């Protein structure tokens, strides 16, 4: 956690990341995504390099994105990374048929949406998506997400 390491241990993690990106020449030739669940970290990257795409991480499901929340997100981030349950909530056994409006709400405010939590080892994927990771990816892409973050890059690259 960059904020903790900076305040408690005196380590400049943000500076180290910036320096590493610069020395690898990734800060000018590639699209760089900076992801954090800490808005102060994203704010510092915005100040140092406004071309970095800042992604606010939500590690727990969200079911709604009201305007005041979205307005606050826009102060710090260009995109969000939300877990699958934020788009397709689950019961104890299956994913519900009702999707949330989170992707539409974020897109209406020009915030990109990435979804994470894809793994071929989860029970709900097997039951709801016929044990087929491609069907799972297709289902979330059909919901309008801008990208997926997966534990199985080989599966995702074969899908592409």
Predicted regions and their residues:
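Active-site cleft segment of glycoside hydrolase catalytic domains centered on the general acid/base Glu
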Residues: 1-31
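C-terminal active-site rim and adjoining tail of enzyme catalytic domains
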Residues: 4-11, 47-160
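Short, conserved alpha-helical segments within structured domains
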Residues: 13, 37-38
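Hydrophobic, Leu/Ile/Phe/Ala-enriched alpha-helical segments that form helix-helix packing faces
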Residues: 20-24, 45, 106
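Short active-site oxyanion
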Residues: 28-33, 144-147
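Short beta-strand scaffold positions
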Residues: 35-37, 150
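Short, well-ordered alpha-helical microsegments
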Residues: 39-43, 156-157
